[in-house]
Amino acid sequence: MADISYWTLLVPPLAGGVIGYFTNDLAITMLFRPYKPIYIGGKQVPFTPGLIPRNQERLARRIADAILGSLLTPEELQNLARRLLQVQRVKAVIHWLLQTSLSQIQAQSEQRSAQVLANILRDFFGSALPRLMKVWSRREDFLEPQLNQLFDQVLVELQLSDEQAEKLADWLLSVMLPPDRLRLAIIDFLTDRTINVLDQELRQNTSGTYWVVANLVGVRNTLIRLREYCLNEREACNRRLGDLITALALRQRLVEALQNLTLQSLPLGTVRELRQLFRQTVRSYIQEQGASVIETVSQTVEWETISLSILRRLRDSASLGASLEVVSDELALVLDRYLERDMELIVERAIPILDLDRVIVDRVKATSPENLELAIQGIVRSELQAIVRLGGILGFLIGVVQAGVLYWQSLQVP
């Protein structure tokens, strides 16, 4: 057995471990570096640039093929689109778009928006609505439910309050039936012909004491004297009539009559006839005068002012937010039904438009070798380090085997 030093047995494992470790580390480094080709004497040094920088375009194509072939398949894109376009997300997007559009409109000139709305309203009320009213009013059921409801809920139940009846009675006595107007009415009524007719009727159609008075005394002279008194004694007649109105409590009687004046006291058949007459009267008036009335009113209305008020009221209206919520919900449901039905066709048409493979290739090609190395190192740093360590371990094991062989050979030497 030949003597063998410990260094002979120790060096192979250490050298193998060091060589294996740094060889793998160099190999991994050469995947990325150098980033650019190196030239010596006008000739490119082999293995420059690194493997990945030299084949970056081909790598980009392989990455794109792998992603689109196994990851982003049409089926996966459909599933992704379904998750992305859920009803709640679509509703939120639509609501945001509506709010943004409304804010944009509000930020613009109100005067211009008001002018556009004013032109629309002027055209509708001045031209379109009168023509529509002429056509609609020819129908037998034109506004029938609305007019019936108006008659039943307003006119039938209409009854003056105490204050209203008192004011109306005062107006009637002061404007419609003042003493002077009553005096003139008596004068106009007591014509010669009227007096003669009354005298003859009383003489022929009375009996008892009234017949004696009518035939012996007569009323002709009395009525003539009353007429003369009204004509000649105007102030005194007005005072007498005023005293008579007060004595007869005519104001109180008018108040009571006006308070009791209501359609509810009429028979049901009469009320129905009045309702039908009311409906026919309104329809006839609209047929004959409705169009001209609407046109006349439209010409006198300041549509710009009204439009500006509408826009400002709409802008500050609390119901606008609720309306946007409802509209967003309905549009989201409609869009969801459409997408559920045509999702496959939409994705099929969208893939060529998106051109995902070209996007991936361009992004990989546009990435610098330094950033590409950092990205790969960030993803598989631990795995690459494990490969380096594995190289060191394998080199060490090979060195151990070699040391064992040397030791065995030393045993065979006499």
Swiss-Prot record:
One of its GO terms (cellular component) is plasma membrane. It comes from the Bacteria. The chain crosses the membrane at residues 2-22, 386-406. Keywords: Cell inner membrane, Cell membrane, Membrane, Transmembrane, Transmembrane helix. It is a multi-pass membrane protein. Disulfide bonds: none annotated. It is found in: Cell inner membrane. Belongs to the UPF0754 family. This is UPF0754 membrane protein tlr2287. It comes from Thermosynechococcus vestitus (strain NIES-2133 / IAM M-273 / BP-1).
